[in-house]
Regions:
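Conserved SAM/SAH-binding beta-strand->alpha-helix loop
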Residues: 56-58
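Conserved SAM-binding loop of SAM-dependent methyltransferases across substrates and taxa
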Residues: 34-47
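Conserved class I S-adenosyl-L-methionine
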Residues: 24-33
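A structural micro-motif
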Residues: 25, 45-48, 74-76
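S-adenosyl-L-methionine
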Residues: 1-25, 39, 64-82
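Conserved SAM-binding motif I beta-strand of class I
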Residues: 49-54
Length: 82
């Protein structure tokens, strides 16, 4: 079970997070938008690091804000591109 509140109101993302193995070394979230999925998994200790990618600069900026909010800048790599 995910021990974080980030996904509390996001049932679709909770379902995806449940499929990630406990010993995930690196998660790639393509189309990350706000970066909630990688942030939740990093905070819960389910993944060591994550790559959050999006084709839009605005969504990636939201992911950057999420990473900053939770102090994950050193473990959540952000990539812009398609």
């Amino acid at each position: 079970m995910l021990s974080t509140d980030i996904l509390e109101r996001k049932p679709r993302l909770r379902a995806i997070a449940a499929l990630v193995p406990e010993d995930c070394q690196c998660l790639a979230d393509i189309g990350t938008d706000h970066g909630y999925l990688p942030a939740a998994l990093l905070r819960a200790g389910r993944c060591r690091r994550a790559i959050a990618a999006d084709i839009g600069a605005a969504p990636l900026e939201r992911a950057r804000q999420t990473a900053r909010l939770y102090g994950l800048e050193d473990r959540m790599e952000l990539r812009l591109g398609g």
